[in-house]
């Protein structure tokens, strides 16, 4: 299921230059979305920081280059807010993607790898369309087989931000 969810991760929506950026962080927040964009919060990891990664093409893949402030977060306990993208059936999830923007299409990933975090939680988190707050140990990934840049292990759902 993860492979299916990530099949479009490297393909971001092409937004005409005249359309202003809506929301913060990577990805595209559809202005017709019933969900408000995430707001920066003190003590919560910024999607703007996570999206400051750059990539270079090597062989048939994109290899991330993380700035020092992002590398410094590797194996640190962080809090991050985002929108759940379940990877398994059921209303409670232990393994899901957290996105910087809400999904607006059931077949597409709303952001690239810089706007997604794979999350593994100790206790199940109830799926919701509203933003959630998660705390756990962040892994900064430079060579993930699925092309992910970030993962939270040992996470715990903290409810709504």
What is the role of each PLM region?
Residues 1-9:
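Bacterial N-terminal signal peptides
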Residues 13-161:
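OB-fold and OB-like single-stranded nucleic-acid-recognition modules
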